[in-house]
């Protein structure tokens, strides 16, 4: 199994190199996926395990998408990345996913992260998500998925002490999440019948939850979260541990 590292090599090769090296130093295998769409200014020397061309081929094969006639490179790479992440996880080759991006890369990476089940470590390192003007673009991902975000404050293109620190912290974060993640600690693939309880009062909810616990029923409270999104991947209704 490997930690999947995602980013645009023609923009963030240096930061990606640091992340890869640090993850490997901690004893994990890596799988680098390039999501470049031709907007970067450098010609990278680092070779990815999965190229953006391979993602484009996957998008065409699985979804019939190809650049042209209103279909953008961003859409093609997004669809290809979703398919690749789905395949890697389905084959038992993915144990975590980290992406270091700007705005475009975040919007390409998040749909793939959203496809991963509850509990699987997923980390987005980006400064784009902290901008209030863009909040609506990310609501569907963060409200319904356990995606961890490291807000970078500064851009991560190029290299300086700040970017280096962010890359190292991000690599240590995803490594630590993977090291302590256990399928036995999360109700993965354990479908159970359950009752849904709607409520308006916290006091009432606490009383009901206490009574349920007396009967040995595991429960969870959520504010406006669609449980169907969690159950869709066999997470047993996102039950507590």
State the predicted function of each range.
Residues 2-8, 65-72, 89, 93-101, ...:
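Short glycine-rich or small-residue beta-strand-to-loop segments that form or flank ligand, phosphate
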């Amino acid at each position: 199994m490997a930690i999947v590292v995602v980013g645009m090599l023609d923009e963030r090769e240096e930061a990606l190199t640091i992340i890869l090296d640090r993850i490997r130093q901690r004893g994990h295998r890596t799988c680098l996926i390039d999501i470049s769409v031709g907007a970067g200014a450098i010609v990278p020397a680092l070779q990815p395990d999965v190229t953006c061309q391979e993602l484009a081929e996957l998008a065409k094969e699985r979804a019939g998408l190809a650049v042209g006639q209103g279909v953008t490179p961003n859409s093609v790479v997004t669809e290809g990345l979703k398919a690749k992440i789905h395949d890697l996880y389905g084959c038992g080759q993915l144990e975590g996913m980290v992406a270091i991006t700007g705005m475009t890369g975040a919007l390409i990476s998040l749909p793939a992260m959203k496809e991963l089940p509850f509990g699987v470590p997923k980390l987005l390192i980006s400064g784009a998500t902290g901008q209030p003007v863009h909040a609506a673009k990310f609501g569907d991902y963060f409200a319904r998925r356990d995606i961890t975000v490291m807000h970078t404050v500064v851009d991560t293109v190029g290299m300086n002490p700040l970017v280096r620190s962010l890359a190292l912290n991000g690599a240590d974060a995803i490594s630590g999440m993977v090291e302590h993640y256990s399928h036995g600690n999360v109700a993965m693939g354990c479908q159970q019948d359950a009752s849904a309880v709607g409520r308006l009062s916290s006091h009432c909810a606490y009383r009901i939850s206490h009574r349920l616990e007396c009967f040995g029923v595991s429960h969870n409270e959520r504010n406006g979260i669609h449980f169907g999104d969690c159950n869709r991947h066999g997470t047993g209704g996102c039950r507590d541990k």
